[in-house]
Amino acid sequence: MLITINIMRIRNLLLAVAVTTCGSISAQQWPYQNTNLSAHERAVDLTSRLTLKEKADLMWDESAAMPRLGIKPFSWWSEALHGLANQGNVTVFPEPIGMAASFNVPMVERVFTVASDETRAKWNEQYQNGIPTTRFHCLSVWTPNVNIFRDPRWGRGQETYGEDPYLTSLMGQAVVRGLQGPETAKHRKLLACAKHYAIHSGPEWSRHVANINDVSPRDLWETYMPAFKDLVQKAKVREVMCAYQRWDDEPCCGSPK
């Protein structure tokens, strides 16, 4: 499990290095620096060169620099649920639950294209001014939230696209396309993140202690999973955040299921 998680994280780190440095390494020394290789090949090579401590460091939302490997620091945590968060003068759009009520998928994609443009502009400004990448000042956004809003006690329900799996999937895909840019592009504009995988629907106060063990296989696959499947397979989302609670007695972040 650790190897799998690290390889997935390394793939995104390689992409992050590409979108932030774009040729800053003057000479290729190792296979992971060879952009002609597949992401998987590069990730496997880089993982093999990391120490245990370096692998552990990559599991945080703030990845430390690794000068010996030519890797700069990278922050994974920013938010753009309805526009870039915590960044001053940016456009604030309606909450996702409101956008979902429009049933207008192309509009949602345009909204998040604007959000990604503004995120890029903010990041370019800080980069040009020598401001290091930090939390909320980065190119990785933990958006969209494609959980199913079933419990009115959940104080984050407004982050979702409602209780319909099909609509949630369509809206989520539009968000990812708007944030990441065209799949045919050489590099992504941002790294989008599908969250929270899976069966995460509140209430918020019990998210770290809840053990969900009453979900039928049919409900799992017809209600909770479709949006995540579509975001990964169709929209090519670059990140997936696991849920906080347990499912069938196993923490979602460590479940073999």
What role is predicted for each listed range?
Residues 3-14:
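Bacterial N-terminal signal peptides that target proteins for export
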Residues 5, 21-22, 36:
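N-terminal compositionally biased, intrinsically disordered segments and leader/signal-like regions
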Residues 8, 24-28:
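Extreme N-terminus of proteins, especially the signal/transit-peptide cleavage junction
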Residues 14-22:
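Bacterial N-terminal signal peptides
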Residues 27-257:
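Glycoside hydrolase catalytic-domain context in secreted enzymes
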